Amino acid sequence: MARKIFKFRGYTLEELQEMSLDEVIELLPSRQRRSLKRGFLPRQEKVLDKMEKVKDMKNDSGRPIVIKTHCRDMIVLPNMVGYTFGIYNGQEFVEVTIQPEMIGCYFGEFAQTRGRVQHGDPGMGATRSSMFVPLK
């Protein structure tokens, strides 16, 4: 079975990468479009500068270099596809490789800040009252 070709609003990835930023902005949802029309913030420009630096660089193991950033409000653009970003979630850098399907999303959507809590069974040390629970 043939592999489905990715299209964003009717355009292939190659067509999107050839477009100017203004043309791509017009294809994005309204919230992202308004944000990008105001221009990039300094921290967002820093992410774009880091991308240019590591464009063709690889680390010792042959994997692409991870671009670490705290900027969770950066919008994924077509020229970011294929890069690996370390997005900070408040505790650690979550490695995310940008796929074509992520275009138009925010970085923060891919690095969750809250995890699901799975509480343990009550026992010694769980609470102050558990000191009086008999040991098994």
UniProtKB/Swiss-Prot annotation:
It comes from the Archaea. PROSITE patterns: RIBOSOMAL_S19. Keywords: Ribonucleoprotein, Ribosomal protein, RNA-binding, rRNA-binding. Belongs to the universal ribosomal protein uS19 family. One of its GO terms (molecular function) is rRNA binding. One of its GO terms (cellular component) is cytosolic small ribosomal subunit. The keyword Transmembrane helix does not apply. One of its GO terms (biological process) is ribosomal small subunit assembly. The gene is rps19. Protein S19 forms a complex with S13 that binds strongly to the 16S ribosomal RNA. It comes from Methanosphaera stadtmanae (strain ATCC 43021 / DSM 3091 / JCM 11832 / MCB-3). PANTHER family: RIBOSOMAL PROTEIN S19P FAMILY MEMBER (PTHR11880), SMALL RIBOSOMAL SUBUNIT PROTEIN US19 (PTHR11880:SF2). This is Small ribosomal subunit protein uS19. The keyword Transmembrane helix does not apply. InterPro entries: Ribosomal_uS19, Ribosomal_uS19_CS, Ribosomal_uS19_euk/arc, Ribosomal_uS19_SF.
